[in-house]
């Protein structure tokens, strides 16, 4: 055993032992309770960042703790390897996305292995491998058979210069990110999955999940079950009587309608624009906007009057129709009723275009003004109808019922439940993704690829250049034979949304070599007992994976309907930011390692200079580590300098897993210093610790009893904290243990060995390398087996018992000392001991006790 703790040597030795023993290869075992814990699989972007380190360490700690407690634990890993970033990198570097992706996987896998993670690498998957995405294609075809997958036209962002479809994030201020061209909206045929068919189940099943309430609420809002009224405004056009249909949750405000707004793609807009150039121009302008709901929410609200009116269904009054850029054809009916008096967006629109605003809702104690929007205008909880004729005086629910009844009686509409959730469009006009298994035949139309011909393999040697989908130019991929008639045909060149890849990978981990999509092993491991990932995945990934799981269940592939029982959303890793701003307002960000910070006498930062030139930089505050702010910390540099265990210890100690973690160089140094102390104690007491002397607990001296009492008391709390995933306080407990052991005077070697062994096991899940080596070197492995499967220490309840207890001694309510009495001392004995104590004689001024108050187990107060 070396005197000095050398992390590189210790970690290499431990990892060598684990590799030799194939320590993390896991099989099904019906004799043990199982625990399946999964970290969301990473995108192979090139290098791990500190967010990865934190996520995987949390998973690893959980795995090791539960394995020591007798669970059959599994921690797999894979790669979410398809996607647009690989295409962008390929264009920038002139290499196929496949090469860039596989090179990154190799490097990042090496980084994970250097962290000592308990990953069963025999289960590794990469979503870009044909043996994985074959099953994306297979299930897609099953969904097609069942009517869950279907084809319809959808709106996309089209770059007219690059002649390609753009993702929403590639549209910047209405222009293509590469070409700078004004983006157009286009309708193209796309495949969709009927996630709306599962809307009720997706909503209701949230109740049974051990997920953060915040995530559940986000999903509830995204699914968006709404109770309202669907009705129409009648109009006549081209000799036909029609209805302009809208849906509203605020039918109580129907008497406040002063206009209707329709989407640019609405059939009525197209018809009204036929002979009106100004309408056509506005419709074309709307088509240049983004297609994402978020884009619409933030863009400037614009509209143009059509000069056409519909009739109010209850009053018969004319209602002017406008085309609005904020109305989406893909949501609701593509038309909305404008109630500017009680909808904030409509209020702003009406003020902008000088449209009438009517108050039809009142709230007790409030005064309505047209000057500015007030929150209560839209509050249905306090709403009472006014200026609404027969509905005056009705509250929200009563008014909705009454209005709905009248609309139904008039043949205009009725109550309806609607959903914000829309079917999942899975077609992507991109190269690096799962090919959609469809063949286009001139005679037979769209023909599914036969099951025996799966997978449709994506060519890995293409290099995108930004001018359209490379698959459409690849003759080898594109040209094929129709499986129905044998005629020449073309393959579908769209690929699947990469959220498909990540919707079921956790099930494939359980049976990675199966010749079917999943097998019986999947029902052993799934659902996941714990899923770990960032809050940014709360909606799309987590919702899609829930849907995909339910489809697999309904197809008879699995027996469960939810992918994860419990979810932990770990907090972001934050760091300081520093920048300079040029005359044009452009900021250049500097890495904290390249900056020297000065502090005031209270340790607060007051200034900073760049090391390269000694000139000032601006303190930008603490923000999430990111490339854009250049405030990331390279985990590899940290591991190279301090070792993986220090990196792990700091990330677990600095904050509870679900909270944000602020990076601290001093904190990292403190973590390293603590591990050196753990090693140093083991080295300095190696002979005593290695001796396997037994002891009789009943005959131990006071020093031994006190040490054991402290260690087992702290162990009890540490065990509780492990179970509730509060790993920061687990580390605090280990620090208390080391202080107690290191400071124990007169403790015997046998008790030191026992208590140090407890410390090593408590620390092991967090810092497995150093504890594993100390355990082996000091002979614990010979007695209990390797630390990997050593039993979790049991609390010795007898050691916690105390013959004496200490009570606070007060005189006239002021603390004057402490009083030691037998644990089972009577009240009379406690009172006698109190008045006989030196403190009473000193602070009573010779006066006798008038009254003695005893609070059992806590204090004695003598009143004189």
UniProtKB/Swiss-Prot annotation:
It is found in: Cytoplasm. The keyword ATP-binding applies. CDD domains: Anticodon_Ia_Leu_BEm (cd07958), LeuRS_core (cd00812). ATP binds at residue 627. Keywords: Aminoacyl-tRNA synthetase, ATP-binding, Cytoplasm, Ligase, Nucleotide-binding, Protein biosynthesis. A motif ('HIGH' region) lies at residues 42-52. A motif ('KMSKS' region) lies at residues 624-628. SUPFAM superfamilies: Anticodon-binding domain of a subclass of class I aminoacyl-tRNA synthetases, Nucleotidylyl transferase, ValRS/IleRS/LeuRS editing domain. GO terms for cellular component: cytosol. PROSITE patterns: AA_TRNA_LIGASE_I (PS00178). It is an enzyme of class 6 (ligase). GO terms for molecular function: aminoacyl-tRNA deacylase activity; ATP binding; leucine-tRNA ligase activity. GO terms for biological process: leucyl-tRNA aminoacylation. It catalyses: tRNA(Leu) + L-leucine + ATP = L-leucyl-tRNA(Leu) + AMP + diphosphate. InterPro entries: aa-tRNA-synth_I_CS, aa-tRNA-synth_Ia, Leu-tRNA-ligase, Leu_tRNA-synth_edit, M/V/L/I-tRNA-synth_anticd-bd, Methionyl/Leucyl_tRNA_Synth, Rossmann-like_a/b/a_fold, tRNAsynth_Ia_anticodon-bd. Its EC number is 6.1.1.4. Belongs to the class-I aminoacyl-tRNA synthetase family. This is Leucine--tRNA ligase. It comes from Burkholderia orbicola (strain MC0-3). The lineage of its organism: Bacteria, Pseudomonadati, Pseudomonadota, Betaproteobacteria, Burkholderiales. The gene is leuS.
